[in-house]
Amino acid sequence: MKTTCAFALIECFAVMAFSATPALADDPPSAAVALQGLAPVAAAKFAEVAATIDTLRLLRTGGYTLYLRHGNTDNTIPDRVPAVDLNDCSTQRPLTEAGRQLMVKVGDAIRKAHIPIGELKVSPMCRARESAAAAFPKLSPEIDHNLMYVANFTDGEKAPIIANTRRLLSTPVTGGSNRLVLAHAPNLMELIGYFPKEGTLVVFSPRGAKLGFDYIASIPPALWGDLFHQDHK
């Protein structure tokens, strides 16, 4: 049964619908999807939905936006804020070898699942670009500077990035393929209150500029094996 949730006021265990209308600039990140026109409320905890074999079957038909977080990084080497240089990876938190191998496996899983990717939008941060190269070596990514890592930004600096992420999740995908956005967990946290783990593929159904998008399900790296097992029953 399809359940539609109104923004962040209630938990949803099937599909969460999010309006394309932006949250007010003064709203805290955790309330980024709170209903407009109401007094501030505490945002409900985001309910992650595990993908099923039915999710894979939907993705094979195309028409979805897939948000993929980059691979594992070395947290002992933080971004050199405010002197991060997008052309100098030594100024950024680096992707680890384990993170690179994780992304190779995620890319292999997406191909094994026969999920068509028509667009690949990638954050300009080195960890995202390197993750894209590891996962999708035969695709040509489009580097989108409005997918930058937002955790160290002011509200004003975050605004165009969150608006762009909302647009990418809301804009319909045509041609029997899917759009894949490879970026950062804090960006999605700002938008819908969800902080996915490294290498997690998050599935959204675009509904257009006015209606926004539906959150469908998530595929953490460890779930792929179970999905393939179901697929071959």
Give residue spans per PLM region.
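Short, surface-exposed amphipathic charged segments that create phosphate/polyanion-binding patches used
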Residues: D155-A163
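Sec/Tat signal peptide C-region and signal peptidase I cleavage site
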Residues: T21-A25
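Positively charged n-region of N-terminal signal peptides that target proteins for export
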Residues: M1-T4
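A short, acidic, amphipathic alpha-helical segment used as a generic capping/interface helix at domain edges
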Residues: A163-V173
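Bacterial N-terminal signal peptides
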Residues: A8-S19
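Generic beta-sheet signal
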Residues: G63-T65, S177-A183
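Active-site-proximal alpha-helix that buttresses catalytic centers in soluble enzyme cores
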Residues: D27-H145, V150-T154, Y194-V202, R207-G212, ...
